Design a protein with these regions (language model features):
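Conserved, well-structured interaction surfaces
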Residues: 44-48, 52, 57, 90-165, ...
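Bacterial Sec-type N-terminal signal peptides, specifically the leucine/valine-rich hydrophobic h-region
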Residues: 18-21
Length: 362
């Protein structure tokens, strides 16, 4: 779906068409001539792709966008890099791709690691916009609502990390004015910069994310934990929506630039947090563990991160599990990243006998 090539390919297609007007008239009774837009997309595949963007790098081992290392494009890996590495919780010893500056809380527009997060989120948004633009997608109200929540989550992360990012809710826009549905604030005939047309402000984005989540909620599945044998396992439900609303409201003061005047939003944050707490989702504790797991000395927290956490009982507290398995979703951005990249002082080092050196991680 190389939508960014529209302006180049469409004129070429028009030129070829004009050169063949002497052909039969039936040859002109065509549908969309833009080869970058599939007139009959695989709805199920596109729906799955919207979820895959949370944990996968791409469809075939390569990233969804141009990058030197596909593993660096994974959303989960980038969320860890920017939520944990700049804090005292973790440090990264690597020096490539700008991660050293992230460790030191030095953020500049040219930082490659920062770009990876931005490009991943915009890539996800493009797939979500595509799905939501299709008439056929609206036939299943539940799945349509799920993707609305996924897109709202993408923009919530953009709001949280970047403040005032580019906002686009259309596909294949020819001009910045056609990139979204909120052009009433711009006067016709007046010249605006690209940033003015596409960056609508943190207050706008806060209100938009809130409205999308509230609009999607009624059509979502009920808040209910599932196991990996259930067909609805891994899907967005009302619990996911409530949790995201609670997080949005909790930090409203920053997003709306009105710290100290947020009692109404704190009350809303509490309301939606209590909805999750009072739902069927529960914390995984000893009473829910199998006798075998107890005999092996595991704690409930341990089982949350096991390969069988979709069937060992731990999924009772997983509001939005990110789906991975060793056969279908391999990569260096998800769980493999945490296994291969993390090390602490109590772990044995791995010796590279050929190089006569030791390595703690990658």
């Amino acid at each position: 779906m190389k939508l960014n090539k529209f302006n180049i390919i469409a004129p070429a297609a028009a030129l070829l068409l004009s050169a063949s007007l002497s052909s039969c008239m039936d040859d002109l009774n065509k549908g969309n001539i833009d080869p970058t837009v599939d007139a009959n997309p695989n709805i199920t595949g596109l729906y799955s792709k919207c979820y895959a963007g949370l944990i996968m790098e791409g469809n075939d081992g390569n990233a969804d966008f141009s990058i030197d290392d596909a593993g660096k494009s994974c959303l989960l890996r980038n969320l860890f890099n920017f939520n944990e590495v700049p804090t005292d919780e973790a440090a990264c010893w690597w020096s490539d791709g700008g991660i050293e500056d992230v460790t030191k809380n030095k953020f500049e527009s040219g930082n490659a690691t920062l770009k990876n997060l931005y490009y991943r989120l915009m890539s996800n948004i493009s797939y979500e916009n595509h799905f939501l633009s299709l008439d056929a997608a609206q036939e299943d109200k539940t799945k349509y609502a799920e993707v609305r929540v996924l897109r709202a989550y993408s923009y919530f992360l953009m709001l949280d990390f970047f403040g005032d990012p580019t906002f686009i809710d259309k596909i294949s826009p020819e001009t910045p004015r056609q990139a979204h549905s909120y052009n009433s604030k711009f006067e016709e005939g007046k010249t605006y910069t690209r940033a003015e047309l596409l960056q609508l402000g943190r207050e706008f984005l806060f209100n938009w994310v809130e409205s999308e989540l509230l609009a999607a909620e009624p059509d979502l599945l009920e808040a209910k934990p599932e196991t990996d044998t259930d067909p609805n396992y891994g899907r967005v439900d009302k619990g996911t929506c409530w949790l995201l609303l609670s997080r949005l409201y909790l930090n409203a003061g920053t997003y709306l630039n009105n710290d100290g005047q947020n009692n109404q939003y704190w009350d809303k944050a509490l309301e939606y947090a209590e909805r999750v707490i009072n739902s069927d989702y529960k914390l995984f504790d000893d009473s829910k563990m199998s006798n075998e797991a107890k005999a092996n000395g595991y704690k409930p927290y341990d089982l949350l991160f096991m390969g069988d956490n979709g069937s060992n009982g731990a999924s009772c507290e997983a509001l939005l599990p990110l789906m991975q398995d060793g056969d279908k979703t391999q990569g260096y951005g998800g769980s493999m990243f945490f296994v291969a990249a993390l090390w602490d002082a109590t772990m044995q080092t791995v010796t590279d006998k050929d190089a006569a050196t030791t390595a703690n991680t990658w």
